[in-house]
Amino acid sequence: MKGPEKAYLVSDKATKMYSLTMDSSEKNNCGKPPLQDDENPHIKYHCHNNNTKAYDARQREQTSAKKKLCIASLICFVFISAEIVGGYIAGSLAVVTDAAHLLVDLSSFFISLGSLWLSSKSSTMRLTFGWYRAEILGALMSIITIWLVTGVLVYLAIERIIRPDYTIDGTVMLITSACALGANVVLALILHQSGHGHSHAGGKHEHMASEYKPQTNASIRAAFIHVIGDLFQSISVLISALIIYFKPEYKIADPICTFIFSIFVLITTVTVLRDLLNILMEGTPRGIHYSDVKQSILAVDGVKSVHSLHLWALTMNQVILSAHIATDILGESKRILKDVTQNVCSSFPFHSVTIQVEPVEEQSPECMFCYEPTQ
């Protein structure tokens, strides 16, 4: 495209359009310092200049997630085979229960890998945001499978408590449960991730909102919840195996441990389920506060008011902002637009920011769409 790039600021009233020419010496939309003329005078300002960094971060996140899931799947398959054989020989419901949950874990790993593949596909005219939410839907499916399998196993545990006509080989159960515990510890270490609220671009530290911490990839987080549930199960099975090994008459410990484990599993899914539903409901992401973002916008010289401020996320870490701002100095709309974008991008981890500048005299206090949202 020849000539300077244009950015258009549209006013709702009379659809008046302001055309602003942006030169190469200006800052880009995510707060990076302006290029000096002697550095690269041919690069024009563009609204997506910093999207390359966001895209690269997303690619690294997905590559890491796929690698972790593939390794976890291989380890999971090996221990599933061992537990099914060991549980069958020992006659232990708890061991077979653990194998069943590992099988569900393996299925969830495959679902997560599929959702990661889908989320990397390009956007279309129908799916303008792309397939990012496939990652969230895949994680939600994993949580639902945990609940379904847990419900079945609770039923079987109750059956064993009511009808205790079964035998358990304590030795085989003890060996198998110890191996299962080791497998789940390894899986938990592989899938565990930690984040911190810094950006290291360009060798500099950019401190984001103090309460915001980058969240784990949804697919990895759901898989980790699966493994933590199995870890609880393995611990409970090992305890029941020790009891049965030394006191065979206390075989009721086997279904009791299965029942106790189920409660722990449901507890471990609550937090991740809440975050997934918040994303699907277009809620404000955890760690980002509406009032803080609004104050960050109002702090820019020339901004008189903010309305239609919306904060939501496509995935755990892809947060989006859109807002309308009013000013009484339209001659500086270009500067105000860039300052607002820079301010929010340097203070919060926004993946995309859309700002509409409007004349302050066109604001309508009676407009139902401009009201401040309730608490």
Swiss-Prot record:
Spans within the Cytoplasmic topological domain: 1-68, 120-135, 192-223, 273-375
Record topological domains on the Lumenal, vesicle side: 90-98, 157-170, 245-251
UniProt entry keywords in alphabetical sequence: Antiport, Cell membrane, Cytoplasmic vesicle, Ion transport, Membrane, Metal-binding, Transmembrane, Transmembrane helix, Transport, Zinc, Zinc transport
Keyword Transcription regulation in record: no
GO molecular function: metal ion binding; zinc ion transmembrane transporter activity; zinc:proton antiporter activity
Subcellular location per the Swiss-Prot or TrEMBL entry: Cytoplasmic vesicle, Secretory vesicle membrane; Cell membrane
Residues reported in the UniProt entry to bind Zn(2+) 1: H101, D105, H226, D230
Transmembrane segments: 69-89, 99-119, 136-156, 171-191, 224-244, 252-272
Keyword Metal-binding applies: yes
Subunit relationships: Homodimer.
Note: Each subunit of the homodimer independently transports zinc ions in a pH-dependent manner. The cytosolic pH promotes binding of zinc ions to the transporter binding site. Upon change into the organelle-facing conformation, the two histidines of the zinc-binding site get protonated at lumenal lower pH, triggering zinc release into the organelle. The transporter then moves back to the cytosolic-facing conformation where the two histidines get deprotonated at higher pH, resulting in a net antiport of 2 protons.
Protein name (Swiss-Prot/TrEMBL): Proton-coupled zinc antiporter SLC30A8
